Regions:
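Serine-esterase "nucleophile elbow" of acetyl-processing enzymes
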Residues: 1-30
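Residue- and microsegment-level detector for short, conserved "hotspots"
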Residues: 33
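Alpha-helical cap/lid subdomain in secreted, periplasmic
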Residues: 36-178
Length: 178
């Protein structure tokens, strides 16, 4: 049986049972929405749940693609049966039309979305007194100027493991793009 890093962490810390809402290849809009939705569907869990969030790439943009069908299989690549709807994602680097549009700044949009998602969940967890830990599961190479600095500075780093940019991630991106 597949066990996510979050489930393994829960097992090590004796925080079982663990619940995995992740779905491979999805983005951060889905993380925020499904996390909040799960708590609103299970309000008794506000008082006894520790949450571990591994943030996806800022360039994976999610959308709802339809209802959950009975025949879908649960798991990292399958449907998550806890919800009546399912998500899909598109990746900005795979969409030529958006990268050619001079009115769209993909990197700034991705960074604003990323920080907004992080802050939304941090505020949600704090409001409901839910203990949590966040980390970068994928690239964290984000824009670092203008009004973005205000959003970046608002992130609570006490609950975010290794928040600052990762040179290792940057080197891998350079190598991949070479």
């Amino acid at each position: 049986t597949y066990m996510s890093v979050h489930q393994k962490l829960g097992e090590k810390l004796a925080l079982e049972p663990t619940i995995m809402l992740a779905k491979g290849g999805r983005g951060n809009d889905r993380i925020v929405t499904t996390t909040m939705h799960w708590f609103y569907k299970n309000p008794e869990r506000f008082k006894d749940t520790f949450v571990s969030i591994g943030w996806s790439s800022s360039h994976r943009w999610d959308y709802i693609n339809g209802p959950t069908l009975e025949e879908k299989v649960a798991g990292i690549k399958g449907a998550v049966k806890d919800f009546s709807y399912q998500w899909a994602s598109w990746r900005t680097w795979e969409q030529d039309w958006i990268s050619r549009d001079p009115d769209v700044d993909i990197d700034y949009t991705a960074t604003f979305k990323m920080y907004t998602n992080i802050l939304a969940l941090q505020h949600f967890f704090k409001y409901h007194n839910i203990p949590y830990l966040m980390y970068w599961a994928l690239s964290n190479d984000l824009q670092q100027d203008g009004d973005l600095i205000h959003l970046k500075d608002a992130v609570d780093r006490k609950h975010f493991y290794n928040f600052e940019e990762s040179e290792h991630v940057k080197e891998n991106i350079k190598r991949y793009n070479a």
